[in-house]
């Protein structure tokens, strides 16, 4: 059975700080390629969104991921924050579309369940598990850890989907 190495970019969008994490995945093994944060300037929102889109597109062109994964929008009590997060998410989706990447979306609960084993895990628990799972020298910043967790969730989820498809093929 052929298990090609896939490169996945995970994106944790935010209007001020957008985290990114790029991993490789082959079979049940994963490793870290790059991670970081896009910290936007204190410009007006349209310039911050453009910066997010431009920097993500540059990262995609440099690292050439095969797939992208992003966190689904969740409900906010603050509607202004929700709107800004949705706009930052839109900028990230435009960057992936410009580079012809397919995008998978996962809820925060799914991501935490996949990485920590508990859907209500704290940010610190996610950060710690990402550090351990990817054998990083030190724990990444919270936004980058979340992005790496999103990429890990996608690697796990897509691997499971492939196995289910293979099993289904042998049953018919």
UniProtKB/Swiss-Prot annotation:
Residues at which Mg(2+) 1 binds: 12, 143
Binding-site residues, Mg(2+) 2: 71
Annotated localization: Cytoplasm
Cofactor binding remark: Binds 2 Mg(2+) ion per subunit.
Source organism superkingdom: Bacteria
Catalytic reaction list: Endonucleolytic cleavage at a junction such as a reciprocal single-stranded crossover between two homologous DNA duplexes (Holliday junction)
Keyword annotations of the record: Cytoplasm, DNA damage, DNA recombination, DNA repair, DNA-binding, Endonuclease, Hydrolase, Magnesium, Metal-binding, Nuclease
Required co-factors: Mg(2+)
Pfam families: RuvC
Keyword RNA-binding: no
GO biological process, one term: DNA repair
Enzyme class, spelled out: hydrolase
GO-annotated molecular function: crossover junction DNA endonuclease activity; DNA binding; magnesium ion binding
Protein EC: 3.1.21.10
Sequence intervals crossing the membrane: none
Keyword Magnesium (UniProt): yes
Family in the record: Belongs to the RuvC family.
Subunit structure: Homodimer which binds Holliday junction (HJ) DNA. The HJ becomes 2-fold symmetrical on binding to RuvC with unstacked arms; it has a different conformation from HJ DNA in complex with RuvA. In the full resolvosome a probable DNA-RuvA(4)-RuvB(12)-RuvC(2) complex forms which resolves the HJ.
Database matches in HAMAP family: RuvC
PANTHER family the record matches: CROSSOVER JUNCTION ENDODEOXYRIBONUCLEASE RUVC
Record's protein name: Crossover junction endodeoxyribonuclease RuvC
Organism (species): Coxiella burnetii (strain RSA 493 / Nine Mile phase I)
Gene that this sequence comes from: ruvC
């Amino acid at each position: 059975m052929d298990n090609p190495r896939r490169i996945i970019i995970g994106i944790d969008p935010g209007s001020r700080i957008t985290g990114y994490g790029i991993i490789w995945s082959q079979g049940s093994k994963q490793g870290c390629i790059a991670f970081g944060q896009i910290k936007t300037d204190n410009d007006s929102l349209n310039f911050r969104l453009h910066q997010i889109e431009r920097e993500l597109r540059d990262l995609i062109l440099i690292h050439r991921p095969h797939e992208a994964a992003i966190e689904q929008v969740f409900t906010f009590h603050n509607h202004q924050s929700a709107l800004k997060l949705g706009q930052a998410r839109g900028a990230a989706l435009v960057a992936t579309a410009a580079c012809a990447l397919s995008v998978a979306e996962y809820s925060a609960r799914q991501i935490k369940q996949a990485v920590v084993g508990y859907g209500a895990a704290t940010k610190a628990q996610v950060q710690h598990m990402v550090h351990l799972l990817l054998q990083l020298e030190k724990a990444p910043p919270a936004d980058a850890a979340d992005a790496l967790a999103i990429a890990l969730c996608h690697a796990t989820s897509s691997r499971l989907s492939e196995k289910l498809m293979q099993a289904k093929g042998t049953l018919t």
